[in-house]
Amino acid sequence: MDSTNGNGADLESANGANGSGVTEALPPPPPVIPPNVEPVRVKTELAEKKGPVRVPMARKGFGTRGQKIPLLTNHFKVDVANLQGHFFHYSVALFYDDGRPVEQKGVGRKILDKVHQTYHSDLDGKEFAYDGEKTLFTYGALPSNKMDFSVVLEEVSATRANGNGSPNGNESPSDGDRKRLRRPNRSKNFRVEISYAAKIPLQALANAMRGQESENSQEAIRVLDIILRQHAARQGCLLVRQSFFHNDPTNCEPVGGNILGCRGFHSSFRTTQGGMSLNMDVTTTMIIKPGPVVDFLIANQNARDPYSIDWSKAKRTLKNLRVKVSPSGQEFKITGLSDKPCREQTFELKKRNPNENGEFETTEVTVADYFRDTRHIDLQYSADLPCINVGKPKRPTYIPLELCALVPLQRYTKALTTFQRSALVEKSRQKPQERMTVLSKALKVSNYDAEPLLRSCGISISSNFTQVEGRVLPAPKLKMGCGSETFPRNGRWNFNNKEFVEPTKIQRWVVVNFSARCNVRQVVDDLIKIGGSKGIEIASPFQVFEEGNQFRRAPPMIRVENMFKDIQSKLPGVPQFILCVLPDKKNSDLYGPWKKKNLTEFGIVTQCMAPTRQPNDQYLTNLLLKINAKLGGLNSMLSVERTPAFTVISKVPTIILGMDVSHGSPGQSDVPSIAAVVSSREWPLISKYRASVRTQPSKAEMIESLVKKNGTEDDGIIKELLVDFYTSSNKRKPEHIIIFRDGVSESQFNQVLNIELDQIIEACKLLDANWNPKFLLLVAQKNHHTKFFQPTSPENVPPGTIIDNKICHPKNNDFYLCAHAGMIGTTRPTHYHVLYDEIGFSADELQELVHSLSYVYQRSTSAISVVAPICYAHLAAAQLGTFMKFEDQSETSSSHGGITAPGPISVAQLPRLKDNVANSMFFC
């Protein structure tokens, strides 16, 4: 949650996108509707909404508190000279000469470049921006609203599977196929239709900079982004959304398993208070190391040799990757593997010459024999290995493994191992000054001012970082035990010679040890001693349960069951708390089953720890921070909590919600998403929370169970949390509800405002029809590319740095906050968007509340990069996600209707937590 996550390793890049390294287009433009067609509006939840549709609120003012500080940011000023001009939008259709549409990815840019080169005068000498799919833009109109062109393209790779010059599962390569093998570069005819679609005034950009956003302004910005993507594509870059990656080995670092972290650059145009800017940042994606396929598989699976490879796993890993085949040099996309090894996999080979009757006879041969006898290639090692299939499902085309090499710049989109992720983070860190140097160089190399289309419409991009004014908010005073108080320094504090503000008592507890490498007795003695120094009374454990050696190779569930049988046989009743020593330092398979058993079957608070022979005091203090919070204690709190001085909270009963949705790993489309909402309790505290967690259809971002009607009852998340607030706050209903939403993009703000907020209001009304609480709704974004730098220091910006001017939205209420101390890499600020405010906070009040909520995270003695409720929601979703066994979703499933789903989707449900832990900070 600190700058470790803001270090330039843009881990979003492990998600989405195909694994073939093919360029991806931006989202398609709105469809063009012919004038004689009356559009029919599709009914959606937003369209059917009763009452006015909410929109993000406008900024009411700027903050003034804090010490002013000059800063630089990675936004580069964009000047637009020709605001009176227009972009013209054209639809592009590509066909082969026989009329078939071109569906092959990646060929469109080559075809359109050829059109521009061949028909330059017919196009009136105009430059154009092409998105690689079906859309083209020009500055000024083309000579005609509809134009047809024919071009001949020298094909550089044959990715369409038509036999392709290697053994086909149904027939041998034809004479034409064999000729293509000997002459891989062959010409192909294409027909291109370019049709007028729309006109986009550049004046819309000026309107957007005044806060008057429209569909035209969004389209104009989209055109500018497409121009930059085309510019990068012509330099041979891999395009990933709005990022580009050069084929330069010096930009790549190995992270293990023949996977490389490839450094590239994100670029996007933004409308800001200071005008138009280009936001440019360093980003990283994972690519596969080019080279022999067999080398990749051995490294990726950590296999001893080619004969130890797990081929079912290899088939999933290789699917859709591109290979270059020796000796022809042709490129193909992998569609699968053969069922049998080369020396056993057969196909029908058609003889070259007809027989006496003029017929071509066939004979069955193996792939290995074909390559030896016909292609004169003796296989060195792959005769006993499966073949690469580059054909179609019903017409396989097999190539021996050793003849295939992976081509450069292919994204790796599978989930990374813990080791790979750690290596990626470590190797992609950049200190602020290094990042600035790299960005300046990249901007110079990109040479956007020489881009013809930008030049023709009078757009120029400054090479200087934008200067902004920030403010450093003072850290809030914290209260600790025995009446002591402290002011954090540089976003950090400690408990040296201090007690927790509300320490708990641990009386009935046990220790379980799944590890053979931990001195448990020493851990227990030290934990009791250090706990006492923090004010926690810890009795001696009832017993230490050691796992028997005979169980250590058993499946995780069996190991957990055996341990609980042992506990139940020796312990009368359920313990208050269990300390569990896991067998592994990270990602133990026991973690999920162990947590599930404790929380859902027995209602036991449990703390897991990594095995250690000699834990130090700091490690055990950090462990006690979690244990104390889980058992209902408080480690530290804001000094103003529970006092009238905390005016924004203490005057009126106020509940704070943190909302997040956690999705499965890349490629796991069948894994349900997990929605978590946490809520503050025991008003006027803002340091204690509880969570409600539900599953929902995979990749659904809007939370679906905020209200869940079951007959006349509401079984939704919000009711559960509101009832808990009421009972824990002396039977007071919240009059103010403050919501922090994480994980949504700007395009989803309207859904959050008009669907999720409506559901929360409905949940309140279902509890009391006359209840009208006031709402404040903010969205927190970490997945952006804005960074801040100190012009006179190589260090990160100080904790508490806030920016609400110049590069913020020209109309809407947003601000950037760097609450934490960036110790490594470059600090990534959190971008807060205030979407809705009925309460009426001033800019200073709201910014100080958000800043203070970064200091109440009970697991840490440092300010965190985003408010604690959001971190807790993320932790709760992640922890309950480990409960799920998704292999068979047919068991204990129920139906949920997705927002865009045509019918009910069966989603496996999470087991309910026992009541005595449901209201705890079990996730801490």
UniProtKB/Swiss-Prot annotation:
Identify a single GO molecular function assigned to this protein. Answer: miRNA binding
Q: Where is the composition biased (Low complexity)?
A: 162-173
Which tissues carry this protein? Expressed in embryos, mature leaves, vascular tissue of the sepals, stamens and stigma, at the tip of the style and siliques.
Keyword RNA-binding recorded: yes
Superkingdom per UniProt: Eukaryota
What residues does the PAZ domain cover?
292-408
Consequence the record notes for mutating residue 874 to A: No effect on RNA binding, but loss of slicer activity
What GO terms in the biological process aspect are recorded for it?
Answer: defense response to bacterium; defense response to virus; gene silencing by siRNA-directed DNA methylation; heterochromatin formation; regulation of translation; regulatory ncRNA-mediated heterochromatin formation; siRNA processing
- Chain intervals with Pro residues compositional bias: 26-37
Location in the cell reads: Nucleus, Nucleolus; Nucleus, Nucleoplasm; Nucleus, Cajal body
Query: Where do the segments described as Disordered lie?
Result: 1-37, 159-185
The UniProt entry, under CDD domains, shows: PAZ_argonaute_like, Piwi_ago-like
Function text: Together with RDM3, required for transcriptional gene silencing (TGS) by DNA methylation and repressive histone modifications (H3K9me2) of several chromatin loci. Component of the RISC complex that associate with the small interfering RNA (siRNA) pathway involved in direct cytosine methylation at endogenous DNA repeats. Forms a AGO4/NRPE1/siRNA complex in cajal body, facilitating its function in RNA-directed gene silencing of target loci. Required for CpNpG and asymmetric DNA methylation as well as histone H3 'Lys-9' methylation (H3K9me) at SUP and SN1 loci.
Family statement drawn from the similarity comment of this UniProt entry:
Belongs to the argonaute family. Ago subfamily.
Q: Check the record and name the PANTHER family matching this protein.
A: EUKARYOTIC TRANSLATION INITIATION FACTOR 2C
Q: Outline the subunit composition.
A: Interacts with NRPE1 (via C-terminus). Binding to NRPE1 is required for its function in RdDM. Interacts with turnip crinkle virus (TCV) capsid protein P38; this interaction inhibits probably RNA silencing ability of AGO4. Interacts with SDE3. Binds to RDM3. Binds chromatin at loci subject to transcriptional silencing. Interacts with MBD6.
What's the protein here called?
Protein argonaute 4
Q: What high-level taxonomic lineage is stated for the organism?
A: Eukaryota, Viridiplantae, Streptophyta, Embryophyta, Tracheophyta
